[in-house]
């Protein structure tokens, strides 16, 4: 696409359409920028996409079409200006006040724009579109916003533009091309935000696009209309409203009834085969409708959209812009009260904005304890600083609440505990006295806890500084059913004492495994392998 110098055109400058050898429908032609400082746009067309419309040629032949003076400076060689075919207004892309096309093979290779011609192109030159943009004076704020945001317009902004357009319709600002019809009213689609679905653990391939059937789920869609009729039509989007296979199974199955109605013959043609309308179950229809059907992409012709919807129809993003978009036809339920869709959309936007603004902290209803500690250790009173990798606690209760399951103390404290455990009969006075002594003894000593994922070398180093120390499990046997506490302590002691040997043995096992893998790989490749011990190469 090329942008050239600006030209001036009178509003009443028209020409009679006589030559209709190539007359494409270019409403879906995408121009990648909203506002241009220049007004003339030159774009290459493709015959397989921008096809000749025979019905439009027969319908518009002999009518007046807007035209403009094409400057000869656009081309490097002489061009037959009399062979340009100016398009009717309803066939122009959005944002153009006039435009014409040179058919395939009309322009010579020398006169065709070099930037738009593919390298190594053979055969006749492709068709060319030359359009004159409307004189749009964007506000200063809009121009600065477009420079900051970029060339593409977000989908949400387009959606809000539709909402503003619906407000203009309600206020009585009806465009001339949108006539009030008795058969149906035109609606605009608003998709409510849906929560994201959790990721599936089973990956699956992408469903290929298909146009033999189209059944979207419209239960979360709002339809905005300027005036209410028994029937309403709305242009759908294959991107925002994709095909859902489960809806197709429900529409073709016998599980539930799909309410049906007759489409008026004065407004809709007779559908046959795959183009026939598909009526949706009520749970997949928008709210406020008693029946509804969907016409798949390409079921209606371009002329139908031009005659019944016109250029006012809100554009929707589509996977394929070369065919007509899908259409929803719904029958409004008169029994249900009317819903103020505009107000509902405003409340939805305000709710989302308030949720995004502040997210207050939510306190859990119950206290969920997270395991922090693994081993509680008594350190000497003269060394109040906890060992490396540990943190201090005030009492054994705090350590046990953090999840400590192993207690490490000096041999003297352990023997005293064992002596008290061997006493079979103890009076209540003795128990209270022992409790007071234990609390007083705990006050004189410092308690430190190690995490579950603490470095085992730091734990072993702290135990070595204590001298002769014993490990015990504070929990009783009833709290750990099926666990042999003595055996667990013996295994933990072996891990602490023989950790270097365990690491060396594990490293040797990994080296042996690597050697076997390399040997098997070399044997499979019929190549000599190198011995790890001596470095010599051997053949087997």
Curated annotation (Swiss-Prot):
<dbReference type="InterPro" id="IPR006610">
    <property type="entry name" value="DM7"/>
</dbReference>
<feature type="region of interest" description="Disordered">
    <location>
        <begin position="416"/>
        <end position="443"/>
    </location>
</feature>
<protein>
    <recommendedName>
        <fullName>DM7 family protein GD24576</fullName>
    </recommendedName>
</protein>
<keyword id="KW-0677">Repeat</keyword>
<comment type="similarity">
    <text>Belongs to the DM7 family.</text>
</comment>
<feature type="compositionally biased region" description="Basic and acidic residues">
    <location>
        <begin position="417"/>
        <end position="443"/>
    </location>
</feature>
